[in-house]
Each structure stands twice: as structure tokens, then as C-alpha cells.
Amino acid sequence: MTDTTVDIAFSPCPNDTFIFHAMLHGLVEKDGLDFRHHMDDIEVLNKKAVLKTFPVTKLSFFAYLKLRKYYEILDAGSALGFGCGPLLICKNPGINLKTAKVSIPGELTTANLLLKLWNPKIKNCVITRFDNILSGVESGEFDAGLIIHESRFVYKDFGLKKIVDLGLWWEQETEIGRAHV
């Protein structure tokens, strides 16, 4: 590594690995820079951002709102879209969300912010690595789970049911989606 080495941190989700693949494997011009990559779960990255561990890092938008004094959003590499927001899922519909044990991908995640805005009475939350939430709900370890990334496309394969699509709820609640239709 050289004195032009930049530490860059992102999650192992497919969006991130796709976004950074060409840069990390020398498939695009890097203008003399070298990159040292660090991959970790989004909640770990959010917490490391609070500590300002990496100069370039993936952040949840919720975490960014708290850290915007120290970080700026790049022109490319951000993943925020319509029809792909977090889902709250369960095995047994009709659970009491006020007392349910809910697995969440992190305290500073945008998914958790949306969950708290949608239902502030949900209090019994357990932070779980995003790729372990589906199996935790399926096994009964958790009553419900807040899923992100590609989990939203496969939760039915685990025999789980959708309680709410928080991305859709947010779009309808704020009418943001109407501006992009």
C-alpha cells in the first residue's frame, strides 16, 4: 500500500459488492489511489462511523443524519429506491407487536427508524446481523423480524408472512413516491 491508500468500508450485501467490485479489482482507473476495503454488517459500520474509523464508509441514511457533520454523501454508490424498503415479517400473524420480540438489523439503521415511526410501541427489539434475521424468525427465536436487502425477496421461502412494507408505508405517508411516478 502507498501513502495514497484510502480505507473504504461497506457491507457484504450484493448491492455494495457490485458497486465497489470494479474499483477494488483494478477494472477502472483509480487515479493513482489504492483502496483497502473493509466489509462488515451495516450496524457495525454505523457504529464504526460514529467513531470515525474509516474516511469512506457505507452508512444507513438514519446514521448519516446523525453524522452529517463528519461525512458527505458521494455522487454514486448510494442505494435508496422505491419498492425495495424494509419489511416487518413474522411466522404467526396476529402477534402483539407491543410485547413481541423483534429482530432488527441495527439501532442506527434506516429500517429501525422507519419501524419506530410506524409503531413507536414496539420496544422489545434485539439487534441481529441482517443475514440471520430470517432464520431467527423461522426458528421461533424471534416473534418478528425487520428485514432488509435481498431478504425481502425470499422471506416467503421460509414460511414467513409480511406484516408491513415500511418502504411503501413511508412513500404513502410522505407522498414522496408520487413525485417519481
Regions found by a protein language model. Give the residues of each.
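N-terminal hydrophobic or amphipathic helices and topogenic motifs
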Residues: 1-79, 86, 90, 95, ...
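Bilobed "Venus flytrap"/periplasmic-binding protein-like clamshell domains
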Residues: 5-25, 39, 84-143, 150
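Short loop/helix-cap segments at secondary-structure boundaries that form the rim of catalytic
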Residues: 66-68, 115, 154-157
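Active-site regions of enzymes building and remodeling cell-envelope glycoconjugates
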Residues: 71-75, 123-124, 159-163
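Short, structured secondary-structure boundary patches
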Residues: 76-82, 165-169
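Ser/Thr-glycine-rich phosphate-binding loops at phosphate-binding pockets of nucleotides
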Residues: 109, 179-180
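Pocket-lining segment of extracytoplasmic ligand-binding domains
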Residues: 130-178
